[in-house]
C-alpha cells in the first residue's frame, strides 16, 4: 500500500513539474486592455512576427505555400513594428531593426518551445494559447 501511495505521489509531482505555464500574456488579453498604447502595438506586431516565423517553420514540409504566406507575414509584422518603434522612440532604421529583431528571435524561440511541448503532449504544435495568439495576428493581416 505504501508503494502504491508513493507511486501516486511521485506521479503527481512529476506531472506538476512537467507542465509549464504559457510563457506569454495572451495577445488577446494584452490588446484588449491596451488598444491605444503604441508600445503594446510594437510588442504585438513583434510577437505576431515571431509567431508567423514559427508557423512558417512547422508548415514548410507539408505545405510550402502556407509556409511562404507566414514568411511574408513575418516580414510585414516586423516591418510594421520597426516603423512604429522608429517613430515612437526617434531612432534610426538600423537601431530599430537591431532592437526588434533581437527580441523577435527570443520570442520565436519561446513559441518554438511552446509548440514543441504541445506536440509532445498532444500531437499538435498548436495548443489553445497559440491558436488564441494566431487569431489576434490574423485580425491584423487579412490574406
Regions found by a protein language model. Name each.
Residues 1-4:
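Positively charged n-region of N-terminal signal peptides that target proteins for export
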Residues 6-15:
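Bacterial N-terminal signal peptides
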Residues 16-23:
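Sec/Tat signal peptide C-region and signal peptidase I cleavage site
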Residues 23-33:
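Repeat-mediated protein-protein interaction surfaces in helical alpha-solenoids
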Residues 27-28, 60, 116:
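Generic signal for short, ordered secondary-structure residues
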Residues 34-90:
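Short N-proximal segments of mature Sec-exported proteins
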Residues 74-143:
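Compact alpha-helical subdomains of small soluble proteins
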Amino acid at each position: 500500500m505504501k508503494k502504491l501511495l508513493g507511486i501516486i505521489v511521485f506521479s503527481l509531482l512529476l506531472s506538476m513539474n512537467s507542465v509549464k505555464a504559457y510563457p506569454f500574456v495572451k495577445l488577446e488579453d494584452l490588446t484588449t486592455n491596451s488598444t491605444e498604447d503604441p508600445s503594446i502595438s510594437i510588442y504585438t506586431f513583434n510577437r505576431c512576427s515571431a509567431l508567423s516565423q514559427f508557423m512558417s517553420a512547422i508548415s514548410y514540409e507539408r505545405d510550402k505555400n502556407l509556409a511562404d504566406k507566414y514568411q511574408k507575414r513575418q516580414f510585414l509584422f516586423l516591418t510594421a513594428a520597426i516603423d512604429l518603434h522608429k517613430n515612437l522612440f526617434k531612432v534610426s532604421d538600423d537601431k530599430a531593426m537591431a532592437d526588434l529583431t533581437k527580441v523577435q528571435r527570443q520570442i520565436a524561440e519561446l513559441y518554438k518551445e511552446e509548440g514543441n511541448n504541445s506536440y509532445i503532449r498532444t500531437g499538435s504544435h498548436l495548443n489553445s494559447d497559440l491558436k488564441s495568439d494566431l487569431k489576434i495576428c490574423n485580425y491584423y493581416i487579412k490574406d
